[in-house]
């Protein structure tokens, strides 16, 4: 039987749709996949010896291609002036969209039918928003949806999951850090200190699993700067702490590290947990509440034939695919995962600007 693949589109528009989504098979597809990925890396470091299948190798090559496109689109306009997102990100985004079918072709060559119309849609939206030049948990969710589609197509198998996280996802994170640093992507939502990270959620979710069985390292260890410096390349959670500590210092004295309590109180609170296993469990609950359960985020989620839309959800309207926000927020105030917010420069952008203005200082200011 020939599969009929269709371009995924937005369907969720209101709280009634959100309730349907929360009880749907599509919701379970994403949540179960994330939980299975999390469970697959319990106790594993980023450099653990894992089986790298041919599909995983192709995924790593896909990310290499994304890196090449970044190199093709350097920042030249107002390079040292504007502290907001760099417009060259749009050139990067356009090139991704133009080349994504070719980039993804090796992944699907063995399939009878070509699903790239669906895969490319999630893939293209995994890097940020072209109009707002920002990035947040909704874009990260698109990358997970892309991987979930590969799993449903049989390209990624359960035995690939450890490699998908400690090789593929960590490489995706490296690509995203490069994009954030080069194009000064703004944090989607702009929740500042009340978020886990200006951009990401999942490295904390997967990273807590890596540490869940560690015999010595405790949650409060994130306050030990020397320990974080020694192990951040091995654990995603510590990489995020290292990244945050690096970009959030005092403008007057770049060498002066600020307390997590000051610039990341949520992470500071989480560090008081009794064990990483508790944090691992809590991260799933938080992901359900603050990402999959937030209308401003899932209003942007797209449904095709691989991840079908739940019955009863609002019909698709062409204007729902506007490149800008294109929705209201239902009159609600969101605690973490809002897709929109006051347009502010990222802490990373402030960091890079300070290096330009104060070349003799080390990074980096947080304002």
UniProtKB/Swiss-Prot annotation:
GO terms for biological process: mitotic spindle organization; response to osmotic stress. It comes from the Eukaryota. It comes from Debaryomyces hansenii (strain ATCC 36239 / CBS 767 / BCRC 21394 / JCM 1990 / NBRC 0083 / IGC 2968) (Yeast). Keywords: Cytoplasm, Isomerase, Rotamase. The gene is RRD2. Coiled coil: none annotated. It is found in: Cytoplasm. This is Serine/threonine-protein phosphatase 2A activator 2. Its EC number is 5.2.1.8. Belongs to the PTPA-type PPIase family. PPIases accelerate the folding of proteins. It catalyzes the cis-trans isomerization of proline imidic peptide bonds in oligopeptides. Acts as a regulatory subunit for PP2A-like phosphatases modulating their activity or substrate specificity, probably by inducing a conformational change in the catalytic subunit, a direct target of the PPIase. Can reactivate inactive phosphatase PP2A-phosphatase methylesterase complexes (PP2Ai) in presence of ATP and Mg(2+) by dissociating the inactive form from the complex. InterPro entries: Phstyr_phstse_ac (IPR004327), PTPA_C_lid (IPR043170), PTPA_sf (IPR037218). GO terms for cellular component: cytoplasm; nucleus; protein phosphatase type 2A complex. Its main location: cytoplasm. GO terms for molecular function: peptidyl-prolyl cis-trans isomerase activity; protein tyrosine phosphatase activator activity. It catalyses: [protein]-peptidylproline (omega=180) = [protein]-peptidylproline (omega=0).
